[in-house]
């Protein structure tokens, strides 16, 4: 944006529009009942009252720690989400190396029969509440290798899945949208009982 020589005030960048929801064309969260209720209470009274469970749920959505379970080419697309162009950490979604420190596991790629026990073991090491994002056609249902004798036809046969991200491979935008949907799901339902 070029400065206007006739004005004496500072140059101000336009307000960020956020990531648009492809279904509505509006920024994600614009019609979220949670945010609408908070906005209404703040405009009405200047403060809002919440239960401790609501506060914990709100805090949990902004501090999700994720770990990768990258098995194939989808893991390369998953790496892009942490890079400066998408920067998933601005949404409170930070990577961790250990399952004991992680809230979310992203399964990306073809899950084979030999790798299935390792997936379950890593999932069991994660603390409660724990969430799983299945990324890509291979993780969702076997994908291109669906009819192979050595492939699990969807990682939901091994661990419970909260969000499915379709595509072969899905783009970084699709994974980012899946992360935002997971945060919305946690806000809406609180702790997901297993």
From Swiss-Prot:
Pfam families found in the cross-reference section: Oxidored_q6 (PF01058)
Location in or out of the cell: Cell inner membrane
Top-level enzyme category: translocase
Cofactor binding, per record: Binds 1 [4Fe-4S] cluster.
GO molecular function: 4 iron, 4 sulfur cluster binding; iron ion binding; NADH dehydrogenase (ubiquinone) activity; NADH:ubiquinone reductase (non-electrogenic) activity; quinone binding
Enzyme Commission numbers on file: 7.1.1.-
Role, per record: NDH-1 shuttles electrons from NADH, via FMN and iron-sulfur (Fe-S) centers, to quinones in the respiratory chain. The immediate electron acceptor for the enzyme in this species is believed to be ubiquinone. Couples the redox reaction to proton translocation (for every two electrons transferred, four hydrogen ions are translocated across the cytoplasmic membrane), and thus conserves the redox energy in a proton gradient.
Protein name: NADH-quinone oxidoreductase subunit B
UniProt source species: Bradyrhizobium sp. (strain BTAi1 / ATCC BAA-1182)
């Amino acid at each position: 944006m070029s400065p206007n020589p006739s004005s004496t005030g500072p140059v101000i960048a336009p307000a960020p529009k956020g990531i648009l929801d492809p279904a509505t064309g509006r920024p994600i969260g614009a019609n979220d009942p949670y945010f609408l209720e908070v906005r209404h209470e703040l405009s009405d009274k200047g403060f809002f009252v919440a239960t401790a469970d609501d506060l914990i749920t709100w805090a949990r959505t902004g501090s999700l720690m994720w770990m990768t379970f990258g098995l194939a080419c989808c893991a390369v697309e998953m790496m892009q989400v942490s890079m400066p162009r998408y920067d998933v950490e601005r949404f409170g979604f930070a990577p961790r190396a250990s399952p004991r420190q992680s809230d979310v596991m992203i399964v990306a790629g073809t899950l084979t029969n030999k790798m299935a026990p390792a997936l379950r073991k890593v999932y069991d090491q994660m603390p409660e509440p724990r969430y799983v994002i299945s990324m890509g056609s291979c993780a969702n249902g076997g994908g291109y290798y669906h009819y192979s004798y050595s492939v699990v036809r969807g990682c939901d046969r091994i661990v419970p899945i909260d969000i499915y991200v379709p595509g072969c491979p899905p783009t970084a935008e699709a994974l980012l949208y899946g992360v935002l949907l997971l945060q919305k799901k946690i806000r809406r339902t609180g702790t997901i009982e297993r």
